[in-house]
Amino acid sequence: MPKPGILKSKSMFCVIYRSSKRDQTYLYVEKKDDFSRVPEELMKGFGQPQLAMILPLDGRKKLVNADIEKVKQALTEQGYYLQLPPPPEDLLKQHLSVMGQKTDDTNK
C-alpha cells in the first residue's frame, strides 16, 4: 500500500535511443536496454543504440516528430516505435509553387 501523500503513477514511460548509423532516427522501447521485442534486422540497420532520454508518456511533454498516441500504441502492440527522419524539403518544388502563384496573381 502506498504511503500517504504518494500517488501511485499509472503513467507509461519510454526510453528513447538515437541511432549510431542513421541521422535523426530514434527507437522508443518500454524498458532501458531491453530490445528483446525489436526485430534483429531493424537492430542491425539501427546500429549501436545511444541513450537519448527517458520520457513519461503522460502528455505533459510533447514529442517533436512523433504522435504520442501512436507511440503508446506501438509500444503496447509491438514493443517498440521507430521514428524516422522527416522527409527532406524540396526547395525547388516550393520555389516553383510560389513562382506559379505569383504568375497566376499577375494574370488576374
UniProtKB/Swiss-Prot annotation:
Disulfide bonds: none
SUPFAM superfamilies: YcgL-like
YcgL domain span: 12-96
HAMAP family, per database record: UPF0745 (MF_01866)
Name of the protein in its database record: Protein YcgL
Organism (species): Escherichia coli O6:H1 (strain CFT073 / ATCC 700928 / UPEC)
